[in-house]
Amino acid sequence: MSQQKQKQCAPPQQCCPPPQQRCPPPQQCCPPPQQCCPPPQQCCPPPQQCCPPPQQCCPPPQQCCPPPQQYCPPPQQTKQPCQPPPKCQEPCAPKCPPPQQCQTSKQK
């Protein structure tokens, strides 16, 4: 009896259709062109990379800016609290430690 590529899934896991690939239990199924992303996300196309939650998928020219690390916009570096990074940026803006605030380099 030739065994087909059918694997029994444990209760925490689920089976995906043959064209799709199975992701870890917290995740679901992703179509073959897409790749599995860590949970809270689901799938991202192959050229794009997975980003943390406030973000999703970013195109290859752009990067995912880490949500825990905040940044200040390059044109406006004032004494204001750092704001969370956008979904995707081509160059990630300069990072600013959360306890500190972004300041302009004072030239005296």
Swiss-Prot record:
Residue stretches of biased makeup (Pro residues): 14-24, 73-100
Top-rank lineage group of the source organism: Eukaryota
Protein's GO biological process: positive regulation of keratinocyte differentiation
UniProt biased composition (Low complexity): 1-13
Region feature (Disordered): 1-24, 73-108
Stated role: Positively regulates keratinocyte differentiation by inducing genes associated with epidermal differentiation.
Protein name as it appears in the record: Small proline-rich protein 5
